[in-house]
């Protein structure tokens, strides 16, 4: 990425670039990926840069790592318009938009304290269906409670 005075962040040789993250959500993406900065891998986080599509956006570059499908699904919940770029020898060899899965299971907790998934006696995984993708709204299949994109991002940022 370039600015009027040159590159803001160096290109990476091998790894993953997550682009078009909503402004302010890059740190949540790092949390989802379990990245603390102590792993030794080179990580670049750019926040609140100009974007034609989003107005402002965040970008995360991770050298030497590719994402699992489960990680991509989680990222889609907090950044539904993100793109995942796979980098090999400084070049983008694959580019893919994330897609919010139709069913989200075992990732989030239902916020309803009376939901069967919250009662300790029942070993039921929380399960949500997508009601809306833009803006993201999920609905618990057991109790019908609606969960907004902001609530999802908050849960995932807390490690939930």
Curated annotation (Swiss-Prot):
Binds 1 zinc ion per subunit. Its cofactor is Zn(2+). Zn(2+) binds at residues 110, 115, 140, 143. Contains catalytic and regulatory chains. Involved in allosteric regulation of aspartate carbamoyltransferase. HAMAP family: Asp_carb_tr_reg. This is Aspartate carbamoyltransferase regulatory chain. The lineage of its organism: Archaea, Thermoproteota, Thermoprotei, Desulfurococcales, Pyrodictiaceae.
